[in-house]
Amino acid sequence: MRIILITGISGSGKSVALNVLEDAGYYCVDNLPAQFIPELTRYLDSQGYTHLGVATDIRSRESLDQLPDTVRALAAEHQVEVVFLTASTDALVQRYSETRRRHPLSVRTDGVPGPGGEPAFNDTALMEAIEMERALLSPLAEAAHRIDTSNVRTNTLRSWIKELIRDDSQRLTLLFESFGFKHGVPSDADMVFDVRSLPNPYYDLALRPLTGRDTPVIDFLQAQPMVLAMAEDIRAYVEKWLPSFIADNRSYLTVAIGCTGGQHRSVYIAERLANYFRAHGNVLVRHRELAPAG
């Protein structure tokens, strides 16, 4: 059975991820304590189910300490992947402000009602709750595939989750992600490469509205020896250290490529690397600052 465990910071998009799994045919359960996952797995296995999606988070905090052992036990018989969703504190505070939902660890701090008569919560208390949750969940994040949703739209997150579940192979999945430094470095990256020193197509008015996936931009960058040299150096570095990540039983390795805006240079380099490494196994590519293709 393929089991995908969705966990992470409240408000980071776990419900969206679980809905994608459900739409893909996974048997899904939300807020299931860790100690019940093996029992559910045995039952579903006996009934012929082949895909299970479980969301577990701080709402079941009494059992979170058991999750690493649970994952190791399940992995002996099943294909198990843990996806940890996170976001910046500022992004989470904004989301809670927009939805007026209560953080699981927040406490009511005043009696002043919100605009619709709902209970109001102090932003300081909310930020403390978020940081407390972040600290409590940090051991889970270290052993999971992390996805930072801070600057990510809902439809983009759906697209990313669909990509992650597309291939049922148990081999390590290599993910190349382009991003713009002006929007922040992805917190889910295992390796980060800065390509801002490369010639920038942005300054060519004909290329400015295009992206690193468009032929004119590709032709421009491929004509620059400096671009090809840096792409080759990054390729060699990733290829040299990839076996150590495989030996560490990692499910995913995220390689982030950053330029200023995440539109031209980083997109081109990420696509070039992905095309090379596809011969080595499972490869995904995503462009954080671009709308999902299709």
Swiss-Prot record:
Record-annotated membrane-spanning stretches: none
Cystine residue pairs: none
Keyword set, alphabetical order: ATP-binding, GTP-binding, Nucleotide-binding
InterPro entries: P-loop_NTPase, RapZ-like, RapZ-like_N, RapZ_C
Binding residues for GTP: D57, I58, R59, S60
GO MF, one annotated term: ATP binding
UniProt superkingdom: Bacteria
Pfam families cross-referenced by the UniProt entry: PapZ_C (PF22740), RapZ-like_N (PF03668)
Annotated binding of ATP, by residue: G8, I9, S10, G11, S12, G13, K14, S15
Family as reported in the entry's similarity comment: Belongs to the RapZ-like family.
Role: Displays ATPase and GTPase activities.
Protein name per its UniProtKB record: Nucleotide-binding protein H16_A0381
Organism of derivation: Cupriavidus necator (strain ATCC 17699 / DSM 428 / KCTC 22496 / NCIMB 10442 / H16 / Stanier 337) (Ralstonia eutropha)
